[in-house]
Amino acid sequence: MLSTHLLFLATTLLTSLFHPIAAHVAKRSGSLQQITDFGDNPTGVGMYIYVPNNLASNPGIVVAIHYCTGTGPGYYSNSPYATLSEQYGFIVIYPSSPYSGGCWDVSSQATLTHNGGGNSNSIANMVTWTISEYGADSKKVYVTGSSSGAMMTNVMAATYPELFAAGTVYSGVSAGCFYSDTNQVDGWNSTCAQGDVITTPEHWASIAEAMYPGYSGSRPKMQIYHGSVDTTLYPQNYYETCKQWAGVFGYDYSAPESTEANTPQTNYETTIWGDNLQGIFATGVGHTVPIHGDKDMEWFGFA
């Protein structure tokens, strides 16, 4: 069971909220649609979809997951993905949390299990519906998110690795770090948030791999962003998340291939462990790191 792999994780009710993303977003030519009949939706997650006027044949898909206090329509308005979809022709799915605080369930056994009936299951069903409905390319499906949505991005990559080719994580925590030993849904974990859950790459990898027992196929490449002065999800969570994916991909966490200063911009440092993992640490940046849409397009292979 997943719970046997986890360390000293404490859960409490949500006591603080994440800050929304501020972004300049250009006008889009399409419109956001709500979809209510995408299939099994065990936790009542809302689905919103943006289909660009410039839709490619066999288009790609980007799943863009909002922060706490947010909604799918809010993330549509305050992130660049719909605008970028008009340029590159992909579809954007904006899941919307069913909970009053707008956070995602990244704590219950259900959401941390493949086909377990949690939020992750609902989002996965949105992806498969969109592939079928629009003839999308199942090999060009990507996931990204900010804050609570970044946590869910890691969870989606662990629970449904077969669905995604790549992910970008803006200020999140490792998959399983918010696990609730009381099976609390949408629980807040102060121990994890404060960066006090520290373990080895191998242990983190075992936590992620336990979310889909027996899976041996490909996994999405991951790009991890975090700010050095984040006081909501402390910077140690950056290192633990990079450890997790280094362990999953079999990289030596202690010996990255390269480290590039002032990349992709001044005061950002990019660490590359291999083709499947990059970490980007933003000095002087709090919660959350702003979305780098153009860089996401490069990571996803659109640009």
UniProtKB/Swiss-Prot annotation:
Notes on temperature effects: Thermal stability decreased at temperatures above 40 degrees Celsius.
Residues carrying covalently attached carbohydrate according to the record: N189
Family of the protein in this entry: Belongs to the carbohydrate esterase 1 (CE1) family. AxeA subfamily.
InterPro entries: AB_hydrolase_fold (IPR029058), Esterase_phb (IPR010126), Plant_Biomass_Hydrol_Est (IPR050955)
Residues at the active site: S147 (charge relay system)
PTM comment: Glycosylated.
Subcellular location: Secreted
Pathway as given in its UniProt record: Glycan degradation; xylan degradation
Protein name per its UniProtKB record: Acetylxylan esterase A
Top-level division of the source organism's lineage: Eukaryota
GO molecular function: acetylxylan esterase activity
Any Pfam family matching the protein: Esterase_PHB
